[in-house]
């Protein structure tokens, strides 16, 4: 039995092979928005293909239970297809659904919730349509980008899907506008002072990631330089130039991470400027947000989410609420005024410190 026969035997007789071309129709989506086509009984996952579209697909990987394909030519388009706003959408692994109309995105997300409840929770529950933003651009209040080098210059961007190759960019259409200005300027300064990116293969260089947190309502920003070494070239100069250019910067932090894996943040932080946190507001409360503390990524939509949760919960003054995975206490403090007691549970120590401070600063003692 040759290798091809062995492969077909273990795949239940499937004759599909790598580099084969097939004509197929998309029938569904994966949980992360890849199109699913069926060929000889095997599901094939294809990026940038929508339900009911027909196209020519090249098979690029064949496994026992599924295959992966690349869309070569679209022969029949979906009426829900739209032009992606970002010119790097097809290369970058950051976004999955920019080619799908807002209505179809809403349907996709609603169905994903429905399917998850059915398959994992075994709940036969009717799911209301997801509540969508009017304008889903430039909204994210946190971004972390890897730093690399190309043609002798530093680059920042996002990884291609399933790879360690950086798609260099200066503007991301879902990150806040300040981050789109701050990251390229920081990269320019790091190159000016002679810093080099960390190389995962040789373990040379220093700069791993640049991270920004932004307070949507306060216009406060945190900049974090994640480094392989404790040293950082011309720290004082970097801080001086950054604060001069961006008065919104409330704190600048160096995070030391000597690990060789994919964990982004290290354990040790050095505050180069400011108090080590920023503040933002949510539903009438002010919150302290530290580097490792979780805060909802979409500050406008989270208000809609929390208000809807409060409405559905039908809380009573005698209720006792447990806020599991409470983070910095945003849900806890939003609910506290409606109930007798709220308990927040969280594994990240820095987040609990922020939560206690947030309860105190907002006068919440229950």
Give the label of every model feature segment.
Residues 203-217:
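Short edge beta-strands and adjacent turn/loop segments
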């Amino acid at each position: 039995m040759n290798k091809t026969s062995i492969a077909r035997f273990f795949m239940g007789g499937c004759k599909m092979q790598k580099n084969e071309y097939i004509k197929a129709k998309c029938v569904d989506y994966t949980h992360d928005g890849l199109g699913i086509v069926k060929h000889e009984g095997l599901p094939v996952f294809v990026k940038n293909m929508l339900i009911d579209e027909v196209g020519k697909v090249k098979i690029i990987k064949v496994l026992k239970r599924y295959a992966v394909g690349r869309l070569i030519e679209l022969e029949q388009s979906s009426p829900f297809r739209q032009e992606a706003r970002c010119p790097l959408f097809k290369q970058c692994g950051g976004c999955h659904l920019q080619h799908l109309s807002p209505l179809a995105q809403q349907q996709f997300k609603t169905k994903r919730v429905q399917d998850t409840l059915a398959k994992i929770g075994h709940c036969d529950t009717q799911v209301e349509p997801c509540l969508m933003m009017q304008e889903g651009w430039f909204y994210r209040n946190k971004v972390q980008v890897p730093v690399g080098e190309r043609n002798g210059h530093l680059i920042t961007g996002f990884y291609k899907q399933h790879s360690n190759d950086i798609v260099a960019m200066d503007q991301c259409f879902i990150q806040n506008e300040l981050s789109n200005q701050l990251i390229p300027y920081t990269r320019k300064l790091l190159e000016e002072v002679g810093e080099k990116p960390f190389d995962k293969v040789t373990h040379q260089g220093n700069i791993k990631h640049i991270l920004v947190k932004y307070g949507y309502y306060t216009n406060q920003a945190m900049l974090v330089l994640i480094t392989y070494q404790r040293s950082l070239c011309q720290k004082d100069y970097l801080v001086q130039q950054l604060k001069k250019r961006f008065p919104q910067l409330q704190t600048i932090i160096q995070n030391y991470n000597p690990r060789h894996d994919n964990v982004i943040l290290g354990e040790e932080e050095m505050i180069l400027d400011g108090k080590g946190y920023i503040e933002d507001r949510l539903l009438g409360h002010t919150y302290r947000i530290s580097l490792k503390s979780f805060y909802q990524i979409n500050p406008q939509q989270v208000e809609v989410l929390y208000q809807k949760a409060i409405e559905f919960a039908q809380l009573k003054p005698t209720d006792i609420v447990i806020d599991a995975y409470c983070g910095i206490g945003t849900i806890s403090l939003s609910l506290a005024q409606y109930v007798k007691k709220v308990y927040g549970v969280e594994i990240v120590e820095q987040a609990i410190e922020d939560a206690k401070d947030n309860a105190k600063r907002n006068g919440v003692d229950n």
